Amino acid sequence: MYSCTSPSGIKVSLSTPEIWEEFYPKTEMIVTRNRGRVIFPHLDYIIKGLDPGSLYSIYIHLERVDGIKYKFDAGEWKEFAKGDPILPIQYKEHPRGKRTGAEWMSEPVSFAHIKITNNPEIKDQKVILVQSMHKHIPVVTVKQVRHYKTGYQEDFSGEQFRLEATEFMVVTAYQNEILKNLKVHHNKFASGFRSNGKRRLSSDSENSENSPPKRSKLVTPPTISPQIDLPQQTPYYFNQNFVAPQNYQPQFASAQNYNFEVQNNAQLAWNMYYQKQYEFWWQQQQMMMPGQPQELKNEFQSL
């Protein structure tokens, strides 16, 4: 369950069997459609029985356990329907590439970077496509690399290792409350709830373990030069005192002036179309104001 030995004597076992034992057999893995979700507990293995001087490549892939689609009902997983068509296998080579048996056996072989998604449009080398509400199992493949005169050549099929304790159900939200609490207990960044029932506010390392931190949604206002008094409305509407618009033009940059003193706001240049429209409006108001000669008003109204 926690280790497997091939006929050739290669042994693959879990690096942290005590953690997987707490989750099995009700392990659930949340899947996302954006950047993928890191598998937790992590897939860390200990490999023994390799030829210390020979070269090996190590791969991992996920495969469906059966042809059944499940549903969570009355606190347990039950068969629901015939499974969706099985997807092609996606082999992911360990990023260390080809290494000697001695190197592989010297420390745990970790696939903690592998993520899962149910979005077929994601083409990331670290992401494996899975199917929601289906049971999957990780498979480790060890291939010996042989040296020929023409170069290096991997064994065609290699040896595969499936550890039953790593089986998991793919879900879009945790169904089992006990399992959800285990995730939170072992992974401080896991999606879950606090004891008071409120949603955790910290980021989820399962979602993007090595991704850069998300930017705050709060936008810092730009620094405004003190000698510039910006209007609170758009240039077309801000003048309410029938003052000639030419008096306000120096406040704004021209369309060609990219060194405007208001940082990050070089786009605040008047569009000449609206400038002309505003001038026309101002002239109209001036001619309609009380005290203007009647002949000017008549002349304007006749236009």
From Swiss-Prot:
Q: Does the keyword Calcium apply?
A: no
> Do you know which CDD domains this protein is assigned to?
T-box (cd00182)
DNA-binding region listed in the record? 14-195
Q: Where is this region: Disordered?
A: 193-225
Known Pfam families for this protein?
T-box
Q: Which regions are flagged for Low complexity bias?
A: 204-213
**SUPFAM superfamilies in alphabetical order:** p53-like transcription factors (SSF49417)
Cellular localisation:
Nucleus
What InterPro entries does the entry give?
Answer: p53-like_TF_DNA-bd_sf (IPR008967), T-box_DNA-bd (IPR046360), T-box_sf (IPR036960), TF_T-box (IPR001699), TF_T-box_CS (IPR018186)
Q: Does the keyword Transcription apply?
A: yes
Q: Name one GO cellular component term.
A: nucleus
* Job of this protein: Transcription factor. Required for mesodermal induction, acting redundantly with transcription factor tbx-37. Together with tbx-37, acts by inducing cell fates in the AB lineage, thereby playing a role in development of the anterior pharynx.
Q: What is this protein called?
A: T-box protein 38
Species source reads Caenorhabditis elegans
